[in-house]
């Protein structure tokens, strides 16, 4: 079964953690300062992005999820900038604003794609009264499906054990991006997402997958977790769940440019996917694909559902193969975002012959992507009568998917594909034979939507019915 995106509009997530503002100063450098042996950067562009728990929330909002963010800030310009940016992205902000603390701010000076220096403006929020955050968390639990605790060891999660208990008592899964070696404070969490270095600081050095799995399950047992997702850079990710076989996911990153904020993206996609109804295993696959996208970007970054869909389906020139209707709609949406022309045709294709191959090759030349809608077995029998189809639908679709001209093959159960075509609305609908455009199923809907209908000729002498008659008659 192919992996598909959930409807993130159904996801509601509470994010609690260390909120930061990431600032970037960009500019060229071409000389050394006369005052000291350091490069001089001429700042030409300034950019501000939410960081830490705020970046987690922003990632969820970018996918279309509903997110409530709770954390600590100062009463200052960075806090105002964060609130304005996040509110504009439909993040519900619930900041505990403290006058005696500065909002955590990290300033990076960038030149020629490289980070020259980072300056941190922070004092942390250690020792803050737990009564400031816990009531806000508790009040929010009835409105969300999952909870993320984003720990950067800055003080917002100083009372994390109490937070976990409140959420778990309310029946909410708790996902934690941990910090430090004290995993005891995370006892009872649903899932932790340590990177390999963080994992080894607690479990000890690992030299093989088997050793990682063994030590990971020991941690799950010791700290009463339900699962661990260990992120392993170029080696991908490993999901360990109680009572389940380990799931090793290879990295999907094509290029690693900047890992800043990648962990935020992983946990945001993971928790929002579960909130939208995905299994933990499928949510981890989506998070793995998302990580492969954001590490190719500079700085803390988000990704769209279009980018995530592209990462899942890949970009193989040979096409995407047999696909369900829901998946097809997502794939077509991606193609349209790319500006590609989508061509669609349909048929029984009971015995694929040279005429079919030539016809499909011609159809493929008319656009960038070719969809072939195939009658199901019951549909073929209703059209052709007893004894048909000769080949069951899974085999017919597999053969079609193997053709280089074909991108997607999708089944339909009705007598005609009119409903399917009216929902896909390709740029170009084609059909082979002696049809008139106005008589082709779905043609009127395609034309009404601004598309085109075209009739292509079949190669003379090629007929599925004649081939079947010849075989049954012992000829050929």
Swiss-Prot record:
E.C. no: 2.7.1.167, 2.7.7.70
Ranges for region Cytidylyltransferase: 344-476
Involved pathway(s): Nucleotide-sugar biosynthesis; ADP-L-glycero-beta-D-manno-heptose biosynthesis; ADP-L-glycero-beta-D-manno-heptose from D-glycero-beta-D-manno-heptose 7-phosphate: step 1/4; Nucleotide-sugar biosynthesis; ADP-L-glycero-beta-D-manno-heptose biosynthesis; ADP-L-glycero-beta-D-manno-heptose from D-glycero-beta-D-manno-heptose 7-phosphate: step 3/4
GO biological process: ADP-L-glycero-beta-D-manno-heptose biosynthetic process
Keyword terms: ATP-binding, Carbohydrate metabolism, Kinase, Multifunctional enzyme, Nucleotide-binding, Nucleotidyltransferase, Transferase
Keyword tRNA-binding: no
EC class: transferase
Residues noted as binding ATP in the record, renumbered to the chain: 195-198
Coiled-coil region: none
Function: Catalyzes the ADP transfer from ATP to D-glycero-beta-D-manno-heptose 1-phosphate, yielding ADP-D-glycero-beta-D-manno-heptose.
Family assignment from sequence similarity: In the N-terminal section; belongs to the carbohydrate kinase PfkB family.
Protein name: Bifunctional protein HldE
The organism's taxonomic lineage, starting at the top: Bacteria, Pseudomonadati, Pseudomonadota, Gammaproteobacteria, Vibrionales
């Amino acid at each position: 079964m192919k992996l598909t995106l959930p409807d993130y509009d159904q996801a509601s997530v509470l994010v609690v953690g260390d909120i930061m503002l990431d600032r970037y100063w960009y500019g060229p450098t071409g000389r050394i300062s006369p005052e000291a042996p350091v490069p001089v950067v001429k700042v030409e562009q300034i950019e501000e992005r939410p960081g830490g728990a705020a970046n987690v929330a922003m990632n969820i909002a970018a996918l279309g999820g509903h997110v409530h963010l709770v954390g600590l800030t100062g009463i200052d310009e960075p806090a105002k900038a964060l609130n304005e940016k996040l509110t504009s992205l439909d993040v519900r902000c619930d900041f505990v604003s403290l006058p005696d603390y500065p909002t955590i701010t990290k300033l990076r000076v960038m030149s020629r794609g490289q980070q020259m220096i980072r300056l941190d403006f922070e004092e942390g929020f250690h020792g803050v009264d737990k009564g400031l955050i816990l009531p806000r968390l508790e009040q929010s639990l009835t409105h969300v499906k999952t909870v993320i605790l984003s720990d950067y060891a800055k003080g917002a999660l100083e009372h994390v054990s109490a937070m976990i208990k409140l959420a778990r008592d309310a029946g909410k899964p708790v996902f934690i991006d941990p910090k430090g070696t004290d995993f005891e404070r995370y006892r009872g969490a649903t899932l932790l997402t340590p990177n390999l270095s963080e994992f080894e600081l607690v479990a000890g050095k690992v030299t093989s997958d088997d050793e990682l799995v063994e030590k990971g399950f020991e941690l799950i047992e010791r700290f009463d977790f339900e699962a661990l997702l260990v992120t392993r850079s170029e080696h991908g990710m490993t999901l360990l769940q109680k009572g389940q076989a380990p799931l090793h996911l290879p990295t999907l990153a094509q290029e690693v440019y900047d890992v800043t904020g990648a962990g935020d993206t992983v946990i945001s996609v993971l928790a929002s996917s579960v909130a939208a109804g995905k299994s933990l295993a499928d949510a981890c696959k989506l998070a793995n694909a998302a990580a492969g996208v954001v590490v190719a970007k500079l700085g803390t970054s988000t990704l769209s559902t279009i980018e995530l869909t592209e990462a899942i389906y890949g970009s193989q020139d040979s096409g995407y193969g047999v696909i369900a209707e829901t998946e097809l709609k997502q794939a077509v949406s991606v193609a349209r975002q790319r500006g590609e022309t989508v061509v669609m045709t349909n048929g029984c294709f009971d015995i694929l012959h040279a005429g079919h191959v030539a016809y499909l090759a011609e159809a493929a030349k008319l656009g960038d992507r070719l969809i072939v809608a195939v009658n199901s077995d019951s549909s073929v029998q209703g059209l052709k009568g007893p004894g048909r189809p000769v080949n069951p639908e899974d085999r017919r679709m597999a053969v079609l998917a193997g053709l280089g001209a074909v991108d997607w093959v999708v089944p339909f159960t009705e007598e005609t594909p009119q409903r399917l075509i009216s929902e896909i609305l390709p740029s170009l609908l084609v059909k082979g034979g002696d049809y008139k455009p106005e008589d082709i199923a779905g043609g009127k809907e395609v034309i009404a939507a601004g598309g085109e209908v075209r009739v292509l000729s079949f190669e003379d002498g090629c007929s599925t019915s004649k081939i079947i008659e010849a075989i049954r008659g012992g000829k050929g």
